[in-house]
Amino acid sequence: MVSRTERKQHKKRRKWPFWLGGILLVLLLLISGGIFLIYNQVGAVVDTMHSPLSRDSDPDRQKEINQLYKEKDAVNILLLGVDERDGDLGRSDTMILLSINPNTDKMIMLSIPRDTYVNIPGRGMDKINHAYPFGIVDGVGGPDLSVQTVEETFNLSIHSYIRVNMEGFQQGIDAVGGVTVNNAQAFSTGGYNFDQGQITLDGKQALEFIRMRKQDSRGDLGRNDRQRQVIQAAMNEAASFSSITKAGEILDILGNNVQTDLDMDKLQTLLTNYAGARNNITTMEIEGHGETINGIWYYIVSDEEINRVNSEITGHMQEQ
């Protein structure tokens, strides 16, 4: 049960789907769920959200990526949950790499701790979530520098990205009626009490639920686990998506809060060739330790751990 700290009870809502990555599954299910009457509206929203990386202007790269999706090769998609507040450029406080292999119908969900100490191209060593605002300030683009940083850190190719404004995530949860999760430990934050066990969250509660880390004995790793749980639960529920009356509202929210380099063709290809991986997800954590450097706390990851992550994801992608 979730309650206000003054013990005011909140009514539970029905369990409905909403993916933290927003666009990918919701749009695919809208298209596949028989509501073709709004296909043009879906297309318009996808056009609004479509924001290619600067490197996508290279026709050879575009040809390579298009061929990769067409031939059902494994792909890596970087999810960026960006927390934008007044006077803030935004930071990618949620970074999750989805590695999807359609040949085995398997998916790896790798959570990247936001305080991971890495080399950010053009900036030097810093927290990995600072790549996003640095990219904006440097004029190369927040998603662009985030993708480049993840690629160079783990020596893995990122084929697509999805960026979600976390405030839009809150609106989306409300639009579809809430999400149900299993809370591993009771805690209070943001004016809410989150009981241990199965709880149903509205948008604001869900945002507070995935943001908390200071009360979690596992810190960022516990926070990442809650984020993954919200995503997995929503993806599983999305298979029975039926809120057609909410479709227009959800599309508006997506158009205002999501950007991605996935166009309509790639989204339809994901629906056709990649959707089966939703039922076989392996979660991965990055092991490391906290260390204070020049008065700032960082999450230090060894070269051996970086190599392990690379090896597991590369092996997963090469499976037939």
UniProtKB/Swiss-Prot annotation:
One of its GO terms (molecular function) is phosphotransferase activity, for other substituted phosphate groups. Pathway: Cell wall biogenesis. Its main location: membrane. Its EC number is 2.7.8.-. Residues 1-15 are cytoplasmic. It is an enzyme of class 2 (transferase). One of its GO terms (cellular component) is plasma membrane. It is found in: Cell membrane. Keywords: Cell membrane, Cell wall biogenesis/degradation, Membrane, Signal-anchor, Transferase, Transmembrane, Transmembrane helix. GO terms for biological process: cell wall assembly. The chain crosses the membrane at residues 16-36. Residues 37-320 are extracellular. Gene3D superfamilies: LCP protein (3.40.630.190). It comes from the Bacteria. It is a single-pass type II membrane protein. InterPro entries: LytR/CpsA/Psr_CW_biosynth (IPR050922), LytR_CpsA_psr (IPR004474), TagU (IPR023734). Belongs to the LytR/CpsA/Psr (LCP) family. May catalyze the final step in cell wall teichoic acid biosynthesis, the transfer of the anionic cell wall polymers (APs) from their lipid-linked precursor to the cell wall peptidoglycan (PG). This is Polyisoprenyl-teichoic acid--peptidoglycan teichoic acid transferase TagU.
